[in-house]
Amino acid sequence: MQKFKSVEELVIQLRPEKPVYCIRKNSILSASTFFQNKFPGKILYAVKTNPHEEVIKTLLKSGIDQFDVASIKEIKGVRKFSRTAKCSYMHTVKSRESIKEAYFKYDIKTFALDTKDELMKIIESTNNAKDLELFVRVAVSNEHAE
């Protein structure tokens, strides 16, 4: 990955004709550290927001060690750099194969669901595992919301 001191330097050197993808690792580190110092709860980074490996590595370096993943590809992206980071499989509709792979190959214990069918799929695909952490999404009426 090429490094530049500024966007201006990048533009002068590359003279790009198409958009250029830039990752500002120091900004990621700074924002992550600030948020961790101010937020008292657990932080899960949603990998789908930016799954680039440099972003994942930078977040891990900053101390973020929990990730909201929505696919096996995202799990692999985190596991490439950390075997111990907690990945929570938060996509509410998953294939039986991806549940099995997540649980048995990547040691994922946390899953989201919003239907009984998805619950049964998770239970069956993990062979009735007793170490699951399940997040159930509940739809509530918003008829009185303002």
Predicted regions and their residues:
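Active-site loop/helix belt of alpha/beta enzymes
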Residues: 125, 140-146
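A charged N-terminal "starter" segment
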Residues: 1-110, 116-132
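ATP-grasp fold ATP-binding core
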Residues: 133-139
